[in-house]
């Protein structure tokens, strides 16, 4: 019951924050319109073939930018310490924050799908396929929520957290082919992109909806990358607990 109380409290806060509404709802839609205008003319069926990337914009915007800033705000203003003094476990509350962002990500991605349907005649996939996609999307968003926790706990203030998160988000966009299509990358950048764990997760998401891989996922490399993020998150939390 306490977890539900914290979760609903955080969920209400998310919808009252204009900057978080922008990054979770407006920013992903802006990127969809911008990139479809830039690449849609030269790449046939751009929206249909890249809908997984477009939906992942919402995940990265919500987890890396919004969540990290929120955690940094609570950390810098010692709100977590106040919770601990009242008998609330810090990790317990951070998990409630993460879950609240998961719900917002779900709402944001639904908005993107509806806009893509009416603006670009995107056809919704079968319900069973959509459920499988969302299960994978939530699973693959966990490492980025952990990265947001790491940034938020280590940053001295919200401005620092925002700057680090924005840089990390745009680098992730670039090296995963979410900003520039992989086919247009070459040389060393393409090699980095092909081996980047987000590129491979995105490829699996894309395969779920379109039956096409952009790169073949290397699950051992993905597991190693996610394992390192989990280990770093554990070390940072113990240090800042």
What are these regions (language model features)?
Residues 30, 47-119:
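Hydrophobic alpha-helical transmembrane segments of multi-pass membrane transport proteins
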Residues 33-41, 155-195:
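Transmembrane helix segments
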Residues 34-36, 108, 200-241:
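Alpha-helical transmembrane segments of multi-pass membrane transporters/translocases
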Residues 2-8, 180-220:
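Short hydrophobic, aromatic-rich alpha-helical segments embedded in or entering the lipid bilayer
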Residues 19-20, 92, 97, 160, ...:
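Residue-level recognition of membrane-helix boundary sites in multi-pass small-molecule transporters
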Residues 35-43, 68, 116-125, 155-156, ...:
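Short helix-capping/hinge motifs at transmembrane helix termini and TM-loop junctions
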Residues 90, 98-165, 170, 215-223, ...:
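Alpha-helical transmembrane segments and their short interhelical loops
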